[in-house]
């Protein structure tokens, strides 16, 4: 018996919701922009192999890999429930660049924990599993946050509420939007990107942030795409982080001139996203970003839609 789970890329913050909004995305051409994890019966308690486009960026020692930590916390939770743990052999297919702003660590965490749960006949419910995912994300970035793992696992546009036992809930978004994702091929550390943020904010910035986020959520629920796009502004992180992203200002300027609704930093960067309301504009922006924002062979641009499914079982073989 074996199971393979695919976990998609995600946009943390979506500019307007620092640490409280996240969106899962998938390329419209069918490319798998995300990680896959296989779990099968093993001869020992835990063994791990690695594969994929970015396998050379992973630690050599399996016990230094986040997938091992996922297995440890999953084992801990099963012990609490008196559920027997099976011996597992796991394979992480690492297709997501590390430090990309695409929720790379979330992809590995979500795929690993979802696959382990599926392999053991789902002893943990969605919120229990999501809590573990946030714990693992915190281990990497220095603080528990769900804005990548929640959309990666549950799909769609997710708002972190963290009340009444609910970690996140889906917010209705706009099916007609194209999300152009451009990764330049360089790395930005999440921890480094957090360190450059100020420890305190001016009152007018706090007010603007509250207005933008409330306005965006209102526009999503009242089905006003133009207003929603206008409210996607970042006064919390982007003014400080954009200097970490070469050509970001030029890219945003070009995208606006080409007809994009808005452009922002995905997570802590260096990936950016541009939202477009029609395919022609998305293709035009995509071509420009490929020629002017991508810096090396590891970079890429994808035209995406919101991924409403999140992580999913794709079969039993990689």
Curated annotation (Swiss-Prot):
Q: From what superkingdom does this record's organism come?
A: Bacteria
Q: What is its main location?
A: cytoplasm
Q: In which pathway does it act?
A: Amino-acid biosynthesis; L-threonine biosynthesis; L-threonine from L-aspartate: step 4/5
Location in the cell: Cytoplasm
| GO annotation (BP), single | threonine biosynthetic process
Recorded catalytic activity of this chain's protein: L-homoserine + ATP = O-phospho-L-homoserine + ADP + H(+)
Where ATP binds, per the record, is at: 97-107
Q: Name one Pfam family in it.
A: GHMP_kinases_C
InterPro entries, alphabetized: GHMP_kinase_C_dom, GHMP_kinase_C_sf, GHMP_kinase_N_dom, GHMP_knse_ATP-bd_CS, Homoserine_kinase, Ribosomal_Su5_D2-typ_SF, Ribsml_uS5_D2-typ_fold_subgr
Q: Which keywords has UniProt assigned to this entry?
A: Amino-acid biosynthesis, ATP-binding, Cytoplasm, Kinase, Nucleotide-binding, Threonine biosynthesis, Transferase
Which leading EC class covers this enzyme?
transferase
Say if the entry is tagged with keyword Cell wall biogenesis/degradation: no
Query: Cellular component GO terms, alphabetically?
Result: cytoplasm
Q: Which GO terms describe its molecular function?
A: ATP binding; homoserine kinase activity
Instruction: List the EC numbers from the record.
Output: 2.7.1.39
Give the family from UniProt.
Answer: Belongs to the GHMP kinase family. Homoserine kinase subfamily.
Protein task:
Catalyzes the ATP-dependent phosphorylation of L-homoserine to L-homoserine phosphate.
For this protein, the record's PANTHER family field holds: HOMOSERINE KINASE, HOMOSERINE/4-DIPHOSPHOCYTIDYL-2-C-METHYL-D-ERYTHRITOL KINASE
Give the protein name, as stated in the record: Homoserine kinase
**Which organism is the protein's source?**
Aliivibrio fischeri (strain ATCC 700601 / ES114)
Name the gene: thrB
